[in-house]
Design a protein with these regions (language model features):
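Sec-dependent N-terminal signal peptides
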Residues: 4-13
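Acidic, polar-rich low-complexity tracts and alpha-helical solenoid repeat scaffolds
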Residues: 19-459
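Hydrophobic alpha-helical membrane-insertion segments, chiefly the h-region
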Residues: 14-18
């Protein structure tokens, strides 16, 4: 680390000769009433002198060279002075950049940022400042030295160990041309792509700055989606919702509108209990974006709200059926049918319809072993409840026949044995099923239990 700090100090001294060079994409800085140089602005007698950009930058060079002052009054005063000075430097640099970015001496001030964060050992901030320099000032005369010092920093500081290779790649592959707004967005994408939790608040700060500068550009909606995503991951659901609302209001023709509409519905459903509003969002989503990859989930959520929140069973069944008929191969399809069968059996007391629904799952989705097993066992249980024991056994045995050797088949065989022994009073049939367990599941606890049961029944 000492080597890196020394290199930056040397760089600070030797770069003074080029400190007046323009930044990348330099433009003439105009002052009041369009004057090209603030010094050309006529002054009224007795009025204060208007500071120029050069004056401001000259002060920042002095500030950057300033070191914490020692004090003999109180122990710890030096440490506080160091912290206060470091924070003050960053505030001044940030103020300058808000006024003059990306022109004038912005690249020099961005370099000051990097060095100040290193001095303060704020490694996350130094990382961000380094990436920002490389992405935003590709034509700067300072770039080569900044990158070289950056490599030293990444190599010597343990903080960067886990992401070192990624960061080196980003430094090497940063865009070398293109409009500043495009490079800024690529910088945001690079930071977001690191997936570093420590960078989340810094990403948010930079995304808001991007929006301050470029809210009129198409990619602003993407920046808003990134901000909302960070808020969601932090549990800041209300602010995320407001960001989605802002996106839909300000960028109604953007590609991100669909995702914002869908995510708004999810938040209203899951976090705020606004079920009517959520349903309205999902219906609007289905109407406007019928080919979107989230349409099946949106339809499923409409059904789930009618089911779980409004207890409107008939409507819920109808909405679940839309999932099944419109999206027959989706992940929500079998789940919807299972819930339809459950509603029919437990809410509407339509046992026959429920059994038919469960058998429909078995016939239409035979490759879904776990869910088909669940459906057939539910059907068997309904037959047991109505004392139709032979039919119940038939349902359970389908599981064994279709999915032999599975846990579901084992449970189904046990159920058959119990019915034969306890309900139908056919010990021979019970022994027959128990023998299958012993044969097909050797060495298991269930097999040992079945063997003991066989001995007892054969007495």
């Amino acid at each position: 680390m000492k080597k890196y700090l020394t290199s930056f100090l040397i760089f600070s001294a030797t770069s003074a000769a080029i400190a007046h060079a323009p930044a990348d994409s330099v433009a003439i800085q105009t002052g009041i009433d369009g004057a090209e140089n603030e010094k050309d602005i006529p002054k009224e007698p007795g009025t204060a002198t208007v500071a120029s950009e050069q004056d401001y930058f000259d002060f920042l060079r002095i500030l950057h060279a300033e070191q914490p002052k020692k004090s003999g009054h109180l122990l710890g005063r030096l440490a506080r002075s160091s912290k206060d000075l470091g924070e003050h430097k960053i505030s001044e640099y940030d103020t300058y950049l808000k006024i003059y970015f990306p022109n004038a001496h912005s690249d020099h001030v961005q370099r000051f940022m990097i060095e100040s964060f290193v001095d303060q050992e704020k490694w996350d901030e130094a990382e961000l400042a380094l990436l920002k320099f490389v992405y935003l000032y590709p034509n700067s005369a300072l770039k080569k030295t900044v990158i070289e010092n950056g490599y030293v920093l990444l190599e010597e500081e343990d903080y960067y160990q886990s992401d070192r290779d990624k960061l080196v790649t980003l430094l090497q592959e940063a865009p070398r041309s293109g409009e500043i707004q495009n490079r800024y967005f690529k910088f945001l994408s690079a930071v977001h792509g690191l997936r570093d939790p420590k960078l989340k608040p810094l990403f948010k700060r930079e995304a808001w700055e991007y929006l301050r500068l470029y809210s009129h550009l198409p990619r602003a909606s993407k920046a808003l989606m990134g901000l909302a995503g960070v808020d969601l991951s932090n549990g800041a659901h209300h602010s995320a919702l407001m960001i989605y609302e802002k996106l839909m209001t300000m960028y109604p023709t953007s590609r991100e509108f669909a995702s914002a509409l869908f995510q708004s519905g999810k938040l209203k459903q899951e976090q705020f209990g606004e079920y009517n509003e959520a349903t309205a969002n999902f219906r609007q989503f289905l109407k406007q974006f019928p080919e979107h990859r989230f349409v099946a989930e949106a339809q499923y959520r409409i059904a789930a709200i009618a089911d779980q929140n409004f207890n409107d069973w008939t409507t819920a069944i109808g909405e679940y059926e839309k999932v099944v008929t419109q999206h027959p191969t989706n992940v929500y399809t079998i789940t919807s049918l299972l819930r339809v069968g459950e509603i029919q059996a437990t809410k509407l007391r339509q046992e026959e319809e429920a059994i038919a629904t469960y058998n429909r799952i078995a016939s239409e989705y035979p490759d879904s072993t776990v869910q088909v097993t669940k459906a057939l066992q539910r059907a068997g249980k309904l037959y047991e409840k109505s004392k139709e024991y032979e039919e119940a056994i038939a349902q359970y045995m389908v599981v064994h026949e279709k999915y032999p050797g599975t846990e579901g088949a084992l449970v189904s065989l046990e159920k058959c044995a119990v019915i034969y022994e306890k309900k139908i009073k056919r010990k021979d049939k019970a022994v027959e099923k128990l023998n299958i367990i012993v044969k097909e599941y050797p060495g298991t606890k269930k097999a040992k239990k079945a063997a003991k049961r066989i001995k007892k029944l054969n007495k």
